[in-house]
Amino acid sequence: METDAPQPGLASPDSPHDPCKMFIGGLSWQTTQEGLREYFGQFGEVKECLVMRDPLTKRSRGFGFVTFMDQAGVDKVLAQSRHELDSKTIDPKVAFPRRAQPKMVTRTKKIFVGGLSVNTTVEDVKQYFEQFGKVDDAMLMFDKTTNRHRGFGFVTFESEDIVEKVCEIHFHEINNKMVECKKAQPKEVMSPTGSARGRSRVMPYGMDAFMLGIGMLGYPGFQATTYASRSYTGLAPGYTYQFPEFRVERTPLPSAPVLPELTAIPLTAYGPMAAAAAAAAVVRGTGSHPWTMAPPPGSTPSRTGGFLGTTSPGPMAELYGAANQDSGVSSYISAASPAPSTGFGHSLGGPLIATAFTNGYH
């Protein structure tokens, strides 16, 4: 008989793992505890059976638990590839107790420092933070391949009070570069344990390493197995971050903008005058790309910029997008620039400064 008595949850945080207990998912709304017990009774003697129900509506929540007297019943259930109950395919798995979510560390002697410049050394970091109090240890995380640090590290102080003082100032300037400081957190806080529902899957329990700061989501996997990260929007421009492979590649800054090839868009598409002007610019050896129609240095342009008007044929509108389109250009703000501020719905006149940049970070 089913009862309206309060039903236990999945497991208390301290419940030991019972190898004879199974989680049964995908149950039909019509499946009862008696029906569940009867079905799984064919695999072995059932010690306990439970269909989880909503405490208010008393309706089934679509899953339950079955506990066998011995592990042989569990093995028989797992050996069968497909299970169907009440005209619905169900999904039995080995049940694992749910662990309590680790609490965030609020008192610690260790901080995470991110966004360090390439030429910053561990001595620079240690010397800077010594103004706040005694530094017990400082480290930068290095890539073994290049033997260069990856723009972040950790500093350990003598007391938690020093950390509180440092973290009151979120951004610090080291070697003319703004860096971010946060309290270091254990790995259990930074990376959720997830769930495990099969014998072959290993629960990621008990990695006791101290990890990265709260805001550090995406720094590279680095060559130190006792530390790890999940995702970071990036305080070190020019790097791509990949975790958990513990690899990162430095993306070199381009020395000059890459100009598009002319073969895709013939100059004749912009009219005979445009083609003639471009040809004349090349002949004069100005070094300007014909597409830009940029005047030679020292000359006075006939218009406020080198772009053609919106009445000109060609893919200019497609290249920059309309004002109501979700284009990359629309995410930039306008300012004084050689480019014209007219002729485009979204006002391109500007050096294309990304609005997402704040204090040098994004």
UniProtKB/Swiss-Prot annotation:
GO biological process, one term: epithelial cell differentiation
Disulfide bond positions: none
Entry keyword annotation includes Cell membrane: no
KW Cytoplasm (keyword) present: yes
N-acetylmethionine, modified sites: M1
Family to which the UniProt record says this protein belongs: Belongs to the Musashi family.
Protein name, entry field: RNA-binding protein Musashi homolog 1
